[in-house]
Amino acid sequence: MTNYGEIFEVWFDGANGGTGYYGGANEERRVDKKNYYDWPGTIEIVRELQPNAVIFGDAGPDVRWVGNEHGFAYPTTWSNLMRDSIYGGMPEYAKKYSSGQENGTHWVPAEADVSIRPGWYYHPYEDHKVRSLPELLDIYYNSIGRNSSLLLNFPVDKTGQIHENDVRQLNKLVAKVKEDFSRKIALSGSNLSASSENGEYIVDNLLQPEMETFWNPKSGELPATVTIDFGEEQTFNRFLVQENISLGQRVKSFALEIRNENGQWETLAKETTIGYKRILRLPDTKTSAVKFTIHDAKDSPVISHLAFFNAPKLLLAPTIARDKNGQVSFDLSEEGLQAFYSLDGSDPKSGGIAYKESFELLQPATLKAVSKDPITGEFSEPITIAFPLAKKKWKVMNPEKDASKLIDDDPSTNYTSKQNKASIDLGENQEISGFTYYPIQNRYMSGLIKDFEFYTSLDGKNWQKAVFGEFGNIANSPIEQQVEFE
């Protein structure tokens, strides 16, 4: 506590007891989670040695665990907590307390925590499993955008540094978040009106960036509404709203409406809590006016800020998968994008086939695809996949029920042979020049193939060895292995 400089946060994990070394003895222990630890004394030490640090734990006392390790807060997230009813490692904490309580006795805001990798510590075999940009964006919007702070873990590698793959993804996240909020809809020329105003706390205060200025309707007047007339059509897909939390968290439910082409109000979103910050990701919405309505609140609402943004599309190449039966499907990084592809390796940007639905591809082909933003006309970087002959006629001859997982082209499934071998009937004579092996991708791996022999047969009885070898670094780099016959 005294050799690290100033510490921002002291983090007390809820896990305790279990198997480990206790005073030199390697044994398993179970502890009374409620009374075993001297939390008052421990907190006193932190306050003395690091007075500016916040303390994290199930019960805080300053910030609390959000109740999962996915990095997501909840659609309803209160910063208040029944703190005195909770202790570290409490079995029912995640279900009962982690989203906070409307009438909680203490201010203990949520902190979402998640690792940028599958685990909290560094392992070389996870270097290719760093979270994708879409995953990281989901984490951001479902934590920061849901009245929570975010702790994003970066395991330190054996050099004492954060791995370059992790840094690359973090930089992408930072750049995309900045881009999302760079196109703010200017409200200075808009006409703002409110259902009521309380003295100096007028609706125009919403245009000020300071938290201390806010709009406050007259006491007891709910629903309370703010109407924003842009004066002309605007397009947005992000909505941000904040309460002045120095006066507490109050809003229990709110809605966002837009004025449609017929001049009628149409509901765009219905949500619950706001807190320090609530961000909604919305479909591309074009309108000339918006209505923000607070339907329920613990006390007269104090709204410090609201804003609209037109975030550019996350323009990534499609994620492409083909199943055992040769059915090819595309997954786009964001709604509203289009995809184009070719099956001969040619540039799909010009003359490519528009992807509408999954399609059958049985024969070998070089599929090249791009995503397109129809609004800007911009294309993503291309993705190229060399598909071999589909496995539609293949059959695994091993007797185990799950043997078919060996060839199902689903990276999330796996098969372990009790005989350390597998035989596959290709359904017909085929000319092959090699094979690929995709190792198990579970967090805790077993059954990795290190040494191998590969045989072929024309009748299933007489076998000839085609190739043998070793997957040298498979434990540290469990990526697809490609072997060519000589």
What label would you give each PLM region?
Residues 1-222, 228, 232, 240-242, ...:
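Mature catalytic domains of secreted/periplasmic carbohydrate-active enzymes
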Residues 283-295, 486:
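Noncatalytic modules at the cell exterior or secretory-pathway interfaces
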Residues 325-332:
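A short beta-strand segment in extracellular, disulfide-stabilized domains
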Residues 171-233, 242-250, 270, 276, ...:
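Disordered, acidic Ser/Thr/Pro-rich linker "stalks" and the adjacent N-terminal cap
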Residues 298-300, 374-382:
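Short, exposed coil/turn segments at beta-strand boundaries within extracellular/luminal domains
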